[in-house]
Amino acid sequence: MKYINLMLTIILALSLETFHIIDACREIGEVCSKTVFDKCCGNTVCKLRGPFYGECVECLNSGERCWRNSECCSGYCRWFTCQD
């Protein structure tokens, strides 16, 4: 019974820590990975410089890789690239 209580306590502690990590976000200029674990705060976006490695910026410039219109400074993302 003690073993089960110990395991449940450990699982609960790890779960709470995971939720804390997921809720955290990065400010402009900080390192990000464009994942739920390393996301940028607010309306800022992660400008990737390599696989899962980038920096939080206000918006992406023309020619940079994007997923949504809202990520681009121009507001226009076409074929995964910001356009003017």
Curated annotation (Swiss-Prot):
It is found in: Secreted. GO terms for cellular component: extracellular region. InterPro entries: UPF0506. The keyword Cell inner membrane does not apply. The keyword Glycosyltransferase does not apply. Keywords: Disulfide bond, Knottin, Secreted, Signal. It comes from the Eukaryota. Residues 1-24 form the signal peptide. Disulfide bonds join 59-73, 66-77, 72-82. It holds the Pfam family UPF0506. Coiled coil: none annotated. The presence of a 'disulfide through disulfide knot' structurally defines this protein as a knottin. This is Uncharacterized protein SJCHGC09800.
